[in-house]
């Protein structure tokens, strides 16, 4: 099975004013994880339940190819919070870099979608990120 996934995390603001969402920063945590049609909250201001880790691991266990944009970041978080996945991965950002054949183009997901003519939903988080509001505080 081919699966697509993305994580949203908290972040810290560095002394230089940059965002640090690293899973190795002990003050950061996983806010939510989306895989295929499932979206699971882990730690969010508006979420009071218990995250359904089993549904995520069951999908990962059936997955033969995991697809994501800048997937190294998402995989580090996946492993950091205790999920297992050892199958193949495809990174759309690296794929886009290779397809550019040395032409310098932005590699953000938004830029890649615009260049390829992919219709994208409006980015509801863009202003929050500009304002340095972490994902756990963005309304569900």
Describe every region a protein language model picked out.
Residues 25-28, 36-140:
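Active-site-proximal helix-loop-helix substrate-binding element of RNase H-like nuclease domains
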Residues 1-24, 48-56:
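Long, highly charged low-complexity segments
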């Amino acid at each position: 099975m081919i699966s697509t996934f993305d994580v949203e995390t908290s972040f810290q603001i560095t002394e230089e004013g940059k965002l640090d969402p690293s899973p190795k920063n002990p003050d950061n945590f996983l806010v939510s994880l989306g895989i295929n049609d499932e979206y699971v909250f882990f730690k969010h201001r508006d979420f009071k339940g218990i995250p359904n880790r089993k549904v995520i691991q069951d999908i990962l266990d059936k997955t033969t190819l995991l697809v994501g944009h800048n997937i190294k970041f998402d995989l580090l978080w996946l492993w950091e919070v205790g999920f297992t996945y050892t199958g193949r991965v495809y990174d759309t950002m690296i794929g886009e870099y290779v397809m550019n054949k040395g032409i310098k183009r932005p590699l953000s997901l938004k830029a890649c979608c615009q260049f390829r003519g992919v219709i994208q939903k409006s980015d509801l988080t863009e202003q929050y990120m500009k304002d340095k509001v972490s994902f756990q505080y963005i309304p569900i």
